[in-house]
């Protein structure tokens, strides 16, 4: 009987439970970001984390109308670093163990130029708290699936920033739903 209830109610709702948990757990960090008036935000990551950065930046632009860009962390020295100035928010996605040290090194270069740093990483990498201004954690899962999980906090960031600005997140301006039938 208990197994049937778990299959019927809990398993189909796991994604919603995670989103609820994330909203409660991460609300403080997002309110901090939403409460600051950042003119520009940059997302940096490597490998799969770069793809997560692209999605996070897109969602932030779409619903909060804040200029944001995603860059491969290794490319910062090729011009992008010149855009970093005092008070710029740089969000680093650091979920890939083998790329963690290189990405944090790039983030610290941004910090030396006055950037405000947010780190998104997995639980257990608490040493990041000494290097960034605030940290958001996601559960550690197989690295092949971490991208799907890590993008959720960035989508929530876009949501919280938009709500803080008093924007309608359900009807972003100048965006249209489109369907192409071939």
Regions from the PLM with identified roles:
Residues 1-182:
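A SIS-like phosphosugar-recognition module
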């Amino acid at each position: 009987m208990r197994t049937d209830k778990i299959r019927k109610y809990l398993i189909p709702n796991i994604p919603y439970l995670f989103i609820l948990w994330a909203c409660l757990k991460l609300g403080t960090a997002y309110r901090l970001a939403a409460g600051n008036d950042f003119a520009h935000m940059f997302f940096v990551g490597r490998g799969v984390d770069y793809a997560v950065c692209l999605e996070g930046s897109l969602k932030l632009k779409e619903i909060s109308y804040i200029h944001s860009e995603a860059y491969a962390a290794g490319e910062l020295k090729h011009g992008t670093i010149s855009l970093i100035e005092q008070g710029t928010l740089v969000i680093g996605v650091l979920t890939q163990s083998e790329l963690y040290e290189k990405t944090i090194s790039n983030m610290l270069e941004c910090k030396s130029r006055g950037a405000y740093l947010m780190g998104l990483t997995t639980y257990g990498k608490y040493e990041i708290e000494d290097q960034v201004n605030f940290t958001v954690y996601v559960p550690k899962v197989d690295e092949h699936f971490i991208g799907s999980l890590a993008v959720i906090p960035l989508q929530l960031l876009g949501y919280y920033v938009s709500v803080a600005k008093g924007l309608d997140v359900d009807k972003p301006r100048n965006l249209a739903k489109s369907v192409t039938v071939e």
